[in-house]
């Protein structure tokens, strides 16, 4: 049930070796759902469905190097890393050095059986629409969120200008209400209008100073 309602599952417990039962249960769950492990937009290894990694690769929009085409084509046809190492007389450490950058860039993922698979990007889609829909899905369950939190959640593939444009779009279509401050928090917050209580009691701030060095300073130019 948890996997059916989660887009990404980060393997925190098993990576730290603190919960053997969680490790066993996770192995059986990812096998049952045929999940793959790869790098998300924040650089964390996560379990997710193949289609999700296709979306992430589209958002990254990073071209492959010509010298990487041979290994990517190999893992389009088969998923056996041992066969690749045998054909190329390659040690396991050499193989890891070869595939690690491709895993970080999202071009390769690993399946639940230990094999590798090349990620083919989504075709005939508008990149901006994909990014916008990804950000919408990212923030839709947060009743209150700051711009800096959105920036950290989105990852390095999103420029501050893109986040700013999406936040403006969310205001226009009613997904979020405009920035406000909450007690004990110094950052500007955005919130879901339908999830916030006591909207009528929110008071206007007297003054607000945004440092010029803030990467999202341009957002506030129109406010």
PLM region spans:
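Long, low-complexity intrinsically disordered regions
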Residues: 1-223
